[in-house]
Amino acid sequence: MKKTLILILCLFLCTVSFARKRVKVACVGNSITYGIGVSDPDKESYPARLQQMLGEGYTVERFGKPGATLLNKGHRPFMQQKEFKDALAFAGDVVVIHLGVNDTDPRDWPNYRDFFIADYRALIDSFRVANPECRILIARLTPIADRHPRFESGTRDWHDEIQLAIETIAKYAQVQLIDFHAPLYPYPFMLPDAVHPDKEGAAVLAKTVYEGITGDFGGLQMPEIYTDNMVLQHGRLLTIQGKADAGEKVTVSIDRQQLQAVTGADGKWAVDVRPLKAGGPYTLTVSTEKRKQVYENVLAGEVWLCSGQSNMEFYLNWSATAAQDVPQAANSNIRFYDMKARWRTDAVEWDASVLDSLNHLQYYKDTQWTVCS
């Protein structure tokens, strides 16, 4: 009986200990954090999606106040709202802050911009008092689309100024900067009212925060233009770059050069390769501890970018002198990366699936470098 009681007590203590290890994440912000723009904020807001992505080891709570400003002299200061008090009481281990969009209001930024950095620092310090061990991430602002009624009457320029202020705050307050702007900017359809992300946009924000918290960017990834048979520009310093998990060491090898980089908190890395001599073939190897990508038959030479109208699609075998010209095209020292359009711009109606693909910037078919023949 005594042994049974001891065993039950041990199991209870282990359960309590495990429960205490859950990482608390406080998502602090305005209506975008609250979930205005999605039909069910409890399930579709970015904090709700973040909870799904992080899993059982985390507890994510949202403290979003629609209309809230970062500025304490703004029209609805976040630090005067109940959501701020609730966020302090939550004492998150991780605090994600996205504030400043509403400060583009003409009542706020033009009059009180000089207080923005100090007010943001005060907000950060408040969370550090609530939990001295907390980790803080602050976000660059989500885009405001040109459909916004005040876009050209100051909002666009004030939005840009606030972005710069946020970058300054991240540097001097020593907090992690994440980017809510770049992932959404190419997709204005995800901002139906020009400000609030829809369900898909909220998922994009959740992924951005997930990557920022965990450092998981999906491992080593190279741009699509890197394939076998590619051509690298010769005779000049060459930057090779890609993505990997935060903190991962990346090794790049080519032509007896071996260079290393450590991936930043934003998942990006880059190395500068000393000028390559024209010729080859070379082998380009990019690797981390978990993954390796090898590109064979790589040449160093002149890289030309050719772009234009429909005449750029003209095939050599369509020419009047095709019989003489085509046999001369075979040259293993010439490589071709041909980006063909998925859909032609003829006078035909596209269906909804095509429009959806174009909205997602899926303009071109998958391709790779080929040896000219």
Where are these regions (language model features)?
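Bacterial Sec-dependent N-terminal signal peptides
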Residues: 1-21
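C-terminal catalytic domains of large/alpha subunits in multi-subunit enzymes
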Residues: 327-343, 348-361
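Extended acidic/polar, glycine-enriched regions
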Residues: 241-321
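Proline/serine/threonine-rich low-complexity linkers at boundaries of modular beta-sandwich domains
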Residues: 217-222
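Alpha-helical cap/lid subdomain in secreted, periplasmic
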Residues: 1, 20-21, 52, 56, ...
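Structural beta-strand segments of beta-rich domains
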Residues: 228, 236-240
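Conserved SGNH/GDSL esterase-like catalytic core that processes O-acyl groups on lipids
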Residues: 22-27, 32-121, 276, 297, ...
